[in-house]
Amino acid sequence: MEFDADYIIIGAGSAGCVVTDRLSEKGHSVLLLEAGPKDIHPMVHIPAGVLHLLSNPKVNWNYSSEPEESSGNRRIHWPRGRVLGGSSSINGMLYVRGNPADYDGWAQMGCKGWSFENVLPYFRKSENYKNGGDPEHRGTGGPLEVEDYRTVLDLTHAFVEAGHQAGYPKSQDLNGSMPEGVGYSQMTRRGRLRGSTARTFLSRAKKRKNVKIKTEAIVTGLIFENKKC
């Protein structure tokens, strides 16, 4: 395959799919390389299929942490996606933004443009939140389908209420204006199937002529000439 690309992105994971979409929609040519296969495994798309993916070597790197005294010197299994969509294709589909204080902390340490006020517009741009919410914090019309759980178990209601009785504030939207406290999770689902970044961002990017995707392509090194790869 010969393709003269403005950008080569290594890894079609949660970030790689988004960057491919954003660059290509601006007219840049992009070559996206992924070590794993296409996301055609049926369990990738069925929400309950996550149980079959947590250690499946076909779509999972199956990393392990280094032994630490605090964990009893154990190696902890650390699933990471090895498939189009990366870990967004094998995770539990929960949608949880980072805490605003973390972003503000990065900005205070010198990471300009990374305060929560700076990144919030991109959170809003990326999502299509189906359950309303504060329009200053939630977005509609984006490729990432975000919704509240359609079925909530009685045990979940009891857990949230117990947290509230224990003194934690109850948040109506943990991804909205009140991320602290206890509340209900949200998920990324497209129709009745998983809403990975491969099915949302990359699905529209790959229709463009300026995008090429190569799966099962392991990158072993980079060659630079005059500061260009």
Features from the language model and the residues they span:
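N-terminal glycine-rich phosphate/pyrophosphate-binding loop and immediately adjacent elements
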Residues: 1-124
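Conserved redox-cofactor binding core of oxidoreductases
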Residues: 107-226
